[in-house]
UniProtKB/Swiss-Prot annotation:
Functional pathway: Purine metabolism; IMP biosynthesis via de novo pathway; 5-amino-1-(5-phospho-D-ribosyl)imidazole from N(2)-formyl-N(1)-(5-phospho-D-ribosyl)glycinamide: step 2/2
Catalytic activity: 2-formamido-N(1)-(5-O-phospho-beta-D-ribosyl)acetamidine + ATP = 5-amino-1-(5-phospho-beta-D-ribosyl)imidazole + ADP + phosphate + H(+)
GO annotations of cellular component type: cytosol
InterPro entries named in the record: PurM-like_C_dom, PurM-like_C_sf, PurM-like_N, PurM-like_N_sf, PurM_cligase
Stated name of the protein: Phosphoribosylformylglycinamidine cyclo-ligase
Lineage, opening ranks: Bacteria, Pseudomonadati, Pseudomonadota, Alphaproteobacteria, Rhodobacterales
EC number: 6.3.3.1
Length: 348
């Protein structure tokens, strides 16, 4: 009898289910380390459960956020430095949640690639777990999509989904008024926005990713991959202390576009650009690209990753609390009648 012809398998089509299962087993310990009150189930089910009552909520309102990391991924892929890109993913979601006054509760990720490379994927998701643990947020599920023909070799994409909660009536912004003080919390670099511009500037400079960074630190690639700061525990401590009226996460759109998102109609903000020093990375970007200051201010965080809008009579106490939490805090301006953001002084 002729030998039976072997049929086509899913693996022959480029999808390795065994590799996907191996990834889940490898990341389970990291996910378990993110467990918090309210966590009911682990990875592997059709859905993940979370118990709001066990998390201590009486009359909760849920808040959801989703985001990605943009073209910062391209630098991580090209350099092979993927260990912290997951922290960026978490930060972009949970920092947004706290701006609504919510405590992050749980997180899910979506990881898509053309060919699953187990070590690469595990390093990325372990970074996600690290970000979750640092922000008190349980990593309770996710999706790994192996899609042959959709991505070049080694390429991948990430998306994150975070859910938080607050007691009814505790949402932010609330009570913002003229005279409120703006406290700026320092960023540690570009964070996760503006990287299409960053990559264009690097191209113009002629520098390779492994070249020494022209603005200090390690190689250029590693310096630009510094993970987005997590402001969750510090910001929530300030909110619970009383007097905080709003929080603004300074992401795409910079100071110019993000601060007005938390100001009610009829109110604007005045910011003193001389209150803090522009970090070297932004000065290098601006000088290399001959970038005008207004463009810089509506593209990057310019050294301020989160703004806390606080009642004037609580500003000193909240600043002291944030400093005790390890923050570098700068009084950068105030809320004024009007609209939009106006600037005094110069950054460049």
């Amino acid at each position: 009898m002729a030998e039976q012809q072997k049929g086509l398998t899913y693996a022959d089509a480029g999808v390795d289910i065994d590799a996907g299962n191996a990834l889940v087993e490898r990341i389970k310990p990291a996910a378990r380390r993110t467990a918090r009150p309210g966590t009911v189930s682990g990875l592997g089910g059709f859905g993940a459960l979370f118990d709001l009552k066990a998390a201590g909520y009486r009359d909760p309102v849920l808040v959801a956020a989703t985001d990605g990391v943009g073209t910062k991924l391209r630098i991580a892929i090209d350099t092979g430095e993927v260990d912290t890109i997951g922290i960026d993913l978490v930060a972009m979601c949970v920092n947004d949640l706290v701006c609504q006054g919510a405590e992050p509760l749980f997180f899910l990720d979506y990881f898509a690639t053309g060919k699953l490379e187990l070590d690469q994927a595990a390093r990325i998701i372990e970074g996600i777990a690290e970000g979750c643990a640092a922000s008190g947020c349980a990593l309770i599920g996710g999706e790994t999509a192996e899609m042959p023909g959709m991505y070049h070799k080694g390429d991948f994409d990430l998306a994150g989904f975070a859910v938080g909660a607050m007691e009814r009536g505790a949402d932010l912004p609330r009570g913002v008024a003229a005279g409120d003080v703006l406290l700026g919390l320092a960023s540690n670099g570009v964070h996760s926005n503006g990287y299409s511009f960053v990559r264009k500037v690097v191209e113009l400079s002629g520098l390779a990713w492994d070249a020494p960074s022209p603005f200090g630190g390690d190689s250029l690639g590693r310096a630009l991959l510094a993970p987005t700061r997590l402001y969750v525990t510090q910001a929530l401590a300030a909110v619970r202390a009383g007097g905080v009226h709003a929080l603004a996460h300074i992401t795409g759109g910079g100071l110019t576009e993000n601060l007005p998102r938390v100001l009610p109609e009829g109110l604007g903000a005045r910011i003193d650009l001389g209150a803090w020093d522009l970090p070297p990375v932004f000065r290098w970007l601006a000088e290399t690209a001959a970038m005008a200051e207004p463009e810089l201010l509506k593209t990057f965080n310019c050294g301020i990753g989160m703004i806390v809008v606080v009642a004037a009579d609580r500003a000193d106490a909240i600043a002291a609390l944030l400093e005790a939490e390890g923050e570098t805090v700068t009084r950068i301006g105030e809320v004024i009648p009007g609209q939009g953001v106006s600037y005094d002084g110069r950054l460049l």
